């Protein structure tokens, strides 16, 4: 531009001419204006780094999109791509920031310490997760939520400092320290949610007797969602499952800790569709892997009072004298004074199914609210971690 050429001439660069940048170009402009301060070609290892100065030993911060961060910032643009902004931050500063967002500075110190060790171990184990994008971990729930120093405080800083360098180990290797908000009464084995637990035996489901202590403080600890038969049919159609009218929707298999393993939808044509593990939660948009379904179209019969009680738990004797439970949702035949008749099923709640969920999250690893409750009872951070991660060491 003319302004740039004039500036070059003023610097004694006679005959110099300003030219535009390539497809990897980066322009630095003054905030709130269109004035270009300088430009450079990014890519090929070239980037802009902003490093805060030191002020008498006080840790300084850099502002980015309304938040404050420790450490340096790198701005790099790969050919034709968007600008990639990377925060280079010491591990313990990163841990301090993560736990302040994942929990709260006001929580018990031992719970914050447990979260600090989880966050540090997770970061170390997943350091190359986004290496193809030019950084280690992201700041979203895909990795760990990270918004800089906004929620840090004395307790979060202390939790990071007093556990500095500590990780969770199993069998000589660092563990995958997954965590989530609250379990509703029990965590779950990783093999019943995502994948085989052959190489992660420490991620076993445990019944949680602690979390109930703080359940009243947890927003939507118990929540409900309702589906009509039409809504379920439309949901399946939207996912390319061509079902007829829905007649039943129920949990068909649970895990040893009482969480849902499989849920099944039945239609009027006699077909069924089962969804297992995490898909049993995410397909229906549920908050937790721990839930119940009421108002299903399981078998009912009319008693002498004209009431429709469920046939769940009813047993029958077959022609060979063997006793077996009548499957929920079946439509068995009975002998009446007028001959053989089929017992027609009728949903107790008409066309509506109510799903009641307990807790929030995938249920694998450490319950954050459970850690809170354990800390309130006087448990140390190591005891918390060893409760939620079976057979591990902290060192």
Predicted regions and their residues:
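Conserved, single-site charged/polar hotspot
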Residues: 1-395
């Amino acid at each position: 531009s003319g302004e740039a050429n004039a500036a070059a001439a003023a610097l004694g660069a006679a005959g110099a001419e300003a030219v535009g940048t390539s497809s990897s170009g980066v322009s630095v402009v003054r905030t709130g204006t269109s004035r270009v301060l300088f430009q450079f070609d990014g890519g090929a290892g070239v980037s802009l780094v902003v490093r805060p100065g030191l002020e008498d030993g006080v840790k300084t911060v850099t502002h980015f999109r309304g938040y404050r961060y420790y450490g340096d910032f790198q701005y790099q643009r790969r050919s034709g791509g968007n600008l990639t902004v990377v925060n280079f931050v010491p591990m313990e500063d990163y841990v301090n920031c993560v736990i302040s967002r994942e929990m709260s500075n006001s929580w018990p110190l031992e719970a914050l310490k447990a979260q600090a060790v989880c966050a540090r171990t997770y970061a170390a184990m997943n350091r190359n997760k986004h290496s193809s994008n030019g950084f280690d971990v992201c700041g979203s729930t895909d990795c760990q939520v990270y918004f800089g120093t906004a929620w840090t405080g004395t307790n979060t800083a202390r939790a990071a400092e007093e556990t500095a360098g500590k990780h969770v180990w199993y069998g000589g290797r660092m563990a995958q320290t997954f965590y989530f908000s609250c379990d509703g009464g029990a965590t779950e084995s990783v093999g019943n949610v995502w994948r085989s637990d052959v190489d992660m035996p420490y991620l076993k489901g445990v019944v949680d007797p602690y979390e109930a202590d703080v359940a009243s403080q947890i927003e939507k600890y118990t929540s409900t969602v309702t589906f009509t038969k039409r809504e379920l049919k439309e949901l399946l159609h939207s996912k390319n499952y061509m079902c007829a009218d829905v007649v039943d929707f129920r949990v068909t298999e649970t895990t040893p800790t009482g969480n849902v393993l499989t849920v099944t939808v039945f239609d009027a044509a006699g077909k069924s569709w089962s969804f297992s593990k995490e898909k049993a939660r995410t397909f229906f948009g549920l908050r937790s892997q721990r839930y119940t379904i009421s108002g299903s179209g399981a078998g009912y019969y009319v008693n002498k009072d004209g009431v429709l009680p469920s046939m769940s738990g009813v047993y029958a004797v077959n022609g060979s004298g063997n006793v077996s439970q009548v499957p929920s949702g079946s439509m068995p035949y009975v002998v009446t004074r007028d001959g053989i008749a089929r017992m027609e099923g009728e949903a107790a709640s008409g066309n509506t199914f109510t799903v009641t969920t307990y807790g929030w999250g995938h249920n694998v690893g450490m319950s954050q609210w459970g850690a809170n409750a354990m800390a309130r009872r006087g448990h140390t951070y190591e005891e918390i971690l060893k409760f939620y991660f079976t057979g591990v060491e902290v060192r």
